[in-house]
Amino acid sequence: MDIQQQAIGFLGGTFDPIHFGHLRPALEITEALSLQQLFIMPNHIAPHKSASHASARQRSEMVELAISHQARMTIDKRELKRHKPSYTIDTLKELKIEYPNTPICFIMGMDSLISFDKWFDWKSILSYCHLIISHRPGWQNKFNKQVGALVAKHQTTDKHDLHNIQFGKIYFQATSQLAISSTEIRTLLNQDISIDFLTPDSVINYIKEQHLYK
């Protein structure tokens, strides 16, 4: 099947700091699904998270450093400019106005999908985008009734649908699930333990220069 309109992807998160556990799956999804661009979107205030440990500017700059050599990855700063909690549905409405003819793929992990029915206005989200679910190989279905029904209705196994249909599909993509977390990195730094090979060197150097997470 020919691709009619190459989709774009969005990956949101606190990224405090960004690390290879974010970056490797993002790259794999971009390549596997032939996304024309993947936008890394740091949250300003995530409704379900406590205050971050680096400022919005610092988190943004770390993302830019981490993806500086990836031609198909860029940062989207819109949520950092908000002065209120950022909900996914609000961002998707903005994006659909900006990209009216381009399929939008919103990327999330399996843990987010499992609790998807707790998201603000969750039933409307698939009216603006496709959902790409990043998961480890061999995952098992643990959905509740509502999420299970949503998946049954909207799932596709044909990645061409993500380009040829504007919105409304759920696609599962196996990715490398690296056992790295931002919390772990902050804890190691607080204990003066090296974080080499957990995040790009450019991010490590920035953390040192800014004296973050101490």
UniProtKB/Swiss-Prot annotation:
InterPro entries: Cyt_trans-like, NadD/NMNAT, Rossmann-like_a/b/a_fold. It catalyses: nicotinate beta-D-ribonucleotide + ATP + H(+) = deamido-NAD(+) + diphosphate. It comes from Psychromonas ingrahamii (strain DSM 17664 / CCUG 51855 / 37). GO terms for molecular function: ATP binding; nicotinate-nucleotide adenylyltransferase activity. Catalyzes the reversible adenylation of nicotinate mononucleotide (NaMN) to nicotinic acid adenine dinucleotide (NaAD). Keywords: ATP-binding, NAD, Nucleotide-binding, Nucleotidyltransferase, Pyridine nucleotide biosynthesis, Transferase. Its EC number is 2.7.7.18. Pfam families: CTP_transf_like. The keyword Metal-binding does not apply. It is an enzyme of class 2 (transferase). GO terms for biological process: NAD biosynthetic process. The keyword NAD applies. This is Probable nicotinate-nucleotide adenylyltransferase. Belongs to the NadD family. It comes from the Bacteria. Pathway: Cofactor biosynthesis; NAD(+) biosynthesis; deamido-NAD(+) from nicotinate D-ribonucleotide: step 1/1.
